[in-house]
């Protein structure tokens, strides 16, 4: 393998990312003052002239401390974290600084303006993460943030690690090859599989290469061997991907027993906590009411369009809810009135359609769907009436995919996880390919969601849903 051209420069990355955060943290205050001036045509009424310089200097000091916290404590400029995980840490930090700013104003008896304070910290919550991501994107384009990476392993764990890294561009891991002396494939995902150990050491000498150990759980000795060898060759950058597929990860605390090679994983089931369920329910009610208010004109229009063929606008099909309780899952009708007869006739006469139905319980070219129905399905507008299911408590905004009773047997050992949560209007499978993923993958997504539930995950999935719906990914 030829020498690699590595433009990665960690010092420049730290400087650019820190400067970006510093600039836009401070611009948030000036933008807030601009908004106040634009709305009220004056600023002195909210911040007296003799306090303005002090407030600007204080905000600058807060920005320096915040950037220092990002740099030293959270390691945002050196340690590569997934986008949504890093965004959560940014939001949490800025909210803490906003509260500290409020306390500072109270103790110093400065004139307090709720408009300036709300505008300032709202802008900070938007500008800092947005331009952090933009800066990383530009650094990626220049190759400065990209880190040449080799994955050691060629099994399912290694392939899964590669797919995960490809989905997180902002992490900047540029995988150039796999390595496994026992691999049978010459290529994986169009990347070469290195089988000669000397090539690894040659690459290590010629560039700053990151190594990811992603062997299977049956290959633990290989992981130990390569950790030792990479350490002997002074490799500073090594990541281990344990084969923990199926275990809850988001709600897991890790600790060690001193002087023993024992790692303790404390696994929590958040959805089993009454406080978590109350928080999720409150979030569902508030958000669904807001969406209903905004979407009500559109829903009235769709009701009119759907009923033009003489049938009802909304129908409720029985779906499996929490603890196995059946409920009518509301949707705008997207099929002809005699849909069951059409389906029976199709499955009786078309073996290809029958095989597709038995595999996924869906048809890509479904003759039962009306012209209006095809549009509302493609845009997911047919699911808007499920907001009433959310208000009733049958469903959640985010959760596992609503299924019929016959599908429960397809969940096998994961059926207990499915029955622990309310079905959702959207979920992991909707933002991860929707109808383009196979049924086993849908089951995996549903069980993963339940095992790893956090409110932040729900928020992230809702934002991803908006993107998927606008792009119409995997919808039919």
Curated annotation (Swiss-Prot):
Q: Where are the transmembrane segments?
A: 15-35, 52-72, 93-113, 115-135, 283-303
Q: Where would you say this protein principally sits, based on its record?
A: membrane
Gene Ontology terms, cellular component aspect? plasma membrane
* Recorded catalytic activity of this chain's protein: di-trans,octa-cis-undecaprenyl phosphate + UDP-alpha-D-galactose = alpha-D-galactosyl-di-trans,octa-cis-undecaprenyl diphosphate + UMP
One function term, GO molecular function aspect: phosphotransferase activity, for other substituted phosphate groups
What is the E.C. number?
2.7.8.6
Q: Which parts of the chain does the record assign to the membrane side Cytoplasmic?
A: 304-476
Q: Does the keyword Cell inner membrane apply?
A: yes
**Keyword annotations from UniProtKB, A to Z:** Cell inner membrane, Cell membrane, Lipopolysaccharide biosynthesis, Membrane, Transferase, Transmembrane, Transmembrane helix
Q: Which GO terms describe its biological process?
A: O antigen biosynthetic process
> Its topology with respect to the membrane?
Multi-pass membrane protein
Q: State what this protein does.
A: Is responsible for transferring galactose-1-phosphate to the lipid precursor undecaprenol phosphate in the first steps of O-polysaccharide biosynthesis.
Family the UniProt entry places it in: Belongs to the bacterial sugar transferase family.
Name of the protein described by the UniProt record: Undecaprenyl-phosphate galactose phosphotransferase
Give the originating organism. Answer: Salmonella typhimurium (strain LT2 / SGSC1412 / ATCC 700720)
Gene designation: rfbP
């Amino acid at each position: 393998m030829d020498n690699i051209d590595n433009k990665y420069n960690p010092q420049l990355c730290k400087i650019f990312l820190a400067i970006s955060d510093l600039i836009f943290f401070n611009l948030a205050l000036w933008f807030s003052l601009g908004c106040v001036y634009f709305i009220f045509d004056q600023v002195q009424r909210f911040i007296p002239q003799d306090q303005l310089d002090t407030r600007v200097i204080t905000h600058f000091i807060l920005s320096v401390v915040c950037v220092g916290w990002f740099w030293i404590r959270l390691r945002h400029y050196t340690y590569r974290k997934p986008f949504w995980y890093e965004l959560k840490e940014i939001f949490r930090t800025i909210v803490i600084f906003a509260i500290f700013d409020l306390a500072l104003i109270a103790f110093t008896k400065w004139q307090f303006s709720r408009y300036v304070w709300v505008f300032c910290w709202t802008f900070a919550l938007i500008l800092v993460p947005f331009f952090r991501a933009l800066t990383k994107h530009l650094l990626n384009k220049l190759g400065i943030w990209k880190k040449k990476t080799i994955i050691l392993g060629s099994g399912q764990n290694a392939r899964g690690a590669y797919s995960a890294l490809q989905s997180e561009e902002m992490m900047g891991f540029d995988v150039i090859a796999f390595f496994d002396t026992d691999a049978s494939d010459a290529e994986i995902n169009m990347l070469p599989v290195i089988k000669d150990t000397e090539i690894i050491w040659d690459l290590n000498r010629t560039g700053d290469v990151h190594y990811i150990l992603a062997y299977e759980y049956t290959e633990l000795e290989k992981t130990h061997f390569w950790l030792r060898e990479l350490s002997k060759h002074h490799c500073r950058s090594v990541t281990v991907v344990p084969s923990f597929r199926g275990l809850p990860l988001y709600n897991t605390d890790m600790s060690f027993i001193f002087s023993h090679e024992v790692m303790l994983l404390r696994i929590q089931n958040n959805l089993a906590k009454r406080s978590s369920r109350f928080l999720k329910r409150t979030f569902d009610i508030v958000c669904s009411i807001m969406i209903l208010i905004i979407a009500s004109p559109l829903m009235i229009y769709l009701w009119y369009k759907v009923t033009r063929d003489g049938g009802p606008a909304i129908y409720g099909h029985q779906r499996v809810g929490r603890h196995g309780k059946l409920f009518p899952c509301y949707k705008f009708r997207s099929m002809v009135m005699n849909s069951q007869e059409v389906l029976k006739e199709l499955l009786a006469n078309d073996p290809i359609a029958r095989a597709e139905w038995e595999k996924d319980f869906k048809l890509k070219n479904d003759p039962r769907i009306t012209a209006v129905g095809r549009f509302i399905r493609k845009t997911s507008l047919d699911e808007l009436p499920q907001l009433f299911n959310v208000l009733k408590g049958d469903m959640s905004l985010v959760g596992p995919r609503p299924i019929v009773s016959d599908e429960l047997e397809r969940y096998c050992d994961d059926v207990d996880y499915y029955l622990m949560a309310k079905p959702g209007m959207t979920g992991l499978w909707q933002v991860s390919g929707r109808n383009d993923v196979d049924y086993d993958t849908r089951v995996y997504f549903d069980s993963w969601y339940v095992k790893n539930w956090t409110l932040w995950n729900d928020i992230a999935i809702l934002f991803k849903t908006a993107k998927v719906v606008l792009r119409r990914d995997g919808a039919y």
